[in-house]
Amino acid sequence: MKKLIILLFCGASMLLYSQNINGRFSSSLYSFERYDAVNSSEKYIRAYEMLNLNFNYENISVRSFFNLEGNLSNKMEYDPRLRFYHLYFEARNILDLATIKLGRQPIINSVAGGIFDGASVHFKKNDYKFSAYYGANVPAYQKLEIIDDWSDNYLLGGRFTTTVLKDFQFTVAYINKNFKPQPYQAIRLLPDLVTNPILVDIENKSNQFEFITGEVFYTNKNLISVFTSYDYDLNFNQTSKFAVDARIQPIERLGINAYFNYRQPKIRYNSIFAVFDYANTYEVELGADYQISSGITVIGKFANVEYKDDNAQRLGVGLATQWGTLNYRKTFGYAGELDAVSVYSGYTFLEGLLTPSIGVSYTNYKLSPDDSESNNLTTLLAGVNIRPIRLLSFDLQAQYMDNKIYKNDFRLFFKLNYWFNINI
């Protein structure tokens, strides 16, 4: 209650001094059936109320994003639950150089993205950008609290980017994320394997991820683009990932893509899985797309993945048009066998007022090439988007799935969106 009163007081204060208030409100209903046992199931209707609310005064903003969720039937133990995803203060263009954020805010990072409670600063000058952040992990279920034991649950990092060379972008980044797991007890044998087992307290350290990342991006108008990234794991002292993604357009309407990556499994340093023996993978993918006309494009891709003692392949071909898409996908080898066909169509009528959509897919798969029996999966979806005015939309979608595990699985989703932008 105290937190709610403080929030209402802060909200009233921000309302008085704001020049602009904008954001989006969404209300959703999700209906599904959950099986608790072989012949026992319950039907649920779950509601989500989301609000993205921003108060703005010149170059200063307070941004928030939170969600209230709960069941309308068969209530769960923790219902209702309020999640705070964003709640931070932002000051932009300080001395035409810096932007500062303070509070619960998002972080975009290939190693450990998400949200955190803390501070970040962003500098931009000509062809140079630099950002740094420091804070703590968010409590479970995004509660409006500061996590206990900040020293063992923090993350810090930075990112430097420059475009000083024509057609190039260079980036160097660092992240250090700590998260201390809850201690627990386990039964262990003594080294002699004879003495009676003993109960041992297990308490791991907090160091989870520590990475250095390098990126190089090159583009030459519409002819060629190449993106290269490299991740080095400082905890394990080894390369975690190296990837190259390239695209070239040798002639008009034809594009050729090539992708390569070397990848180690991303294991938390303080996880029990860190002591296991694991191997890396190599992946190569080649693809092409050809634009037959202004509204029709043919796409094809083939990839090979090399594991320690085996390999797997995947093949995909498709047709993309202004009315929808048609795709076929096949995988074979160590990763399992799969044949899948999918068709999707969506089109807008009456100047955006009505957008119906429909899709169907059929999949035949084996989890292992040695399996004698294959499984079938059929999926259907149908939906409609209604936008009577630019700021208001309604979405309704029905999903149906059927295989030997989920028989006649039917789900229904409804969503209302309202955007607002008020100048005071």
Q: What do the PLM-derived regions correspond to, one by one?
A:
Residues S41-E49, P80-Y85, G113-D117, D152-L156, ...:
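Residues that define the transmembrane beta-barrel architecture of outer-membrane proteins
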Residues M76-P139:
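Outer membrane beta-barrel
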Residues I21, N59-S64, L95-K101, D127-A132, ...:
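Repeated loop/turn-to-beta-strand initiation elements of outer-membrane beta-barrel proteins
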Residues D36-E42, L72-Y78, P106-S110, K143-D149, ...:
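Outer-membrane beta-barrel domain signature
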Residues S18-I94, A98, R411:
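Beta-barrel outer-membrane channel/assembly domains of diderm bacteria
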Residues D148-Y154, Q169-I202, F211, F332-S393, ...:
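Outer-membrane beta-barrel transmembrane domain signature
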Residues E49-F55, L87-A91, A119-F123, G158-T162, ...:
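Residues on the lipid-exposed face of transmembrane beta-strands in outer-membrane beta-barrel proteins
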Residues L29-E33, Y57-N59, L68-L72, R104-I108, ...:
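Transmembrane beta-strands of outer-membrane beta-barrel pores
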